[in-house]
């Protein structure tokens, strides 16, 4: 019995030992599985971060490429515009260089003739001829005002007797002899490099020219005129106005370069002279006009290009400038010259007297006599007055449609030819005849509203819309029906209102501009 018990005890002990060994061997395996399960989420997180990084990198690359392409388009459009402007300026510079060379040649010839004349004069009276340099005197740019002052004095003295001019020439000759003996090696330059000389040296450069030199008088348009004054800036650049237009069309038209209707040198090119009647211009030349004697005359004129406002010394220079720079525009103007002159004759308002009555000179600019609108420059006022007179001098040769401004005609003719507008929108491709129109249109894409109402704070993209809105606060009703006497706040309401057929309108109550835009700005109500 004891043997059996010992045998069973040994079997049970062995089995328990084997079970313990199995449990010990299974323990490390379960711990490895737990560690592996803990590592799997970390690896998945690393993979997801890598995928997100790659996706973001691809998106950023696509966005950068699209942005670069848009920037290239914008820069390309701007470069093309600048190249066109540079090409036009280069052509004009070449023309001016040719004119300058011819002027220098004429100046040298006149210098030689004056020197020969004085040499013969000295030999006649037994005087020893002096030596003079044959080069053209050099005048610094910063001293051009002194030359203008001298030319003004010479112009005021031009009407004196010939005997007095002969005596003055002899006096200048004797003074030159004295100065050349005192300074035998002096330069004929008006101002040396060391600084400006005394006032006696100013007469040296001009005493070399004869008193009747044609080239000097051809360029008298420079005398006593401040070229940086507001008057001449208005003819070349009119980008903004103190008083805004009432509708988008007028705002686009006023933003063009100043091309007011000007006096003509020929039948086809209207020009404006500095001393034209009906104008109230103020310039430094008026002071010299007050000091002139009754027997003298002020004969200098300023010839202005009607298309770009360039100042020209004479009519021939202006005609060449128009042929070279504005050949197409001059043909269009000549096409519409007969019809516009007939319209002016029928209306009876194109005369100097009526124009002077409608052009009021006020402090700081000009005022329209019809609606009271204020302008900085006379050219812009005359463009605006086409609204009141109904004048549309520019005619399309293809369809016969008429326009108030040449820029509108250019844009219209592009529709016939199928060509691209000079200023296309880079976002939507819409074309505009002037750069200011493109800038206003781009506010639609950018969402910019720069004009705010001072009373309610509402903002507008267009200045004309702001002034139309301000009529709500002021109660202004500038559009009046000439049959029933009703007044309207908006032009569209006025045009849609018809209390009597247009054929029954009495002529004495409907002026020619009543069917057009009877624009009366907020200035009449005290808001300008």
From Swiss-Prot:
Transmembrane stretches, start-end: none
GO molecular function term, any single one: zinc ion binding
Consequence of gene loss (knockout): Gross morphology is normal. Expression of myelin basic protein (mbp) in the central nervous system at 5 dpf is strongly reduced. Expression of mpb in the peripheral nervous system is normal.
GO biological process, one term: positive regulation of oligodendrocyte differentiation
SUPFAM superfamilies linked to this entry: beta-beta-alpha zinc fingers
GO cellular component: nucleus
Segments forming C2H2-type zinc fingers: 303-326, 366-388, 394-416, 423-445, 451-473, 479-501
Coiled coil, from the record: 79-106
Keyword Zinc-finger: yes
Pfam family, one: zf-C2H2
Biased composition (Basic and acidic residues): 232-242, 257-270, 278-293
Family of the protein in this entry: Belongs to the krueppel C2H2-type zinc-finger protein family.
Function: Probable transcription factor. Important for development and migration of oligodendrocyte precursor cells, and normal myelination of axons in the central nervous system (CNS). Functions autonomously in oligodendrocytes to promote CNS myelination. Seems to act in parallel with notch3 during oligodendrocyte development.
Protein name: Zinc finger protein 16-like
